[in-house]
Amino acid sequence: MIKLINILKEMVTPDEINQVDNFADQVLSPVDVDLSSKHVLDRLTGRESDVTFEQLIGFFTRLGQHKKEFIDFFERYNEIVATDRKSKLNIPFINLTNKAIAKTIMRKLNFLSDTPKLTFE
């Protein structure tokens, strides 16, 4: 049964990642979100990915509701982790001249990091 579920599970497509990237740019403007790193693409399009297009849109919708906090964090730190309690998704970002470059994406309830964390729901 588990194999059947894995076969039926839809992977996020590169086109959908592009759509999420554009959506994130809109809700977090003037910060430019970049989801194109190889590791992020591998995590989202790989067989073991449990992250859906809808969950990514939800993540950035909720993060957009905390845009001021996100920008404040981004102005203070070179790296931050955005953590969504609802989806349990964590995205570490590197701050490169007003560009938020996603390092990876993972679903983990108690994600541990020395990097400052912005948690939202």
Predicted regions: what they are:
Residues 2-121:
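Ribonuclease/tRNase effector modules and their secretory precursors
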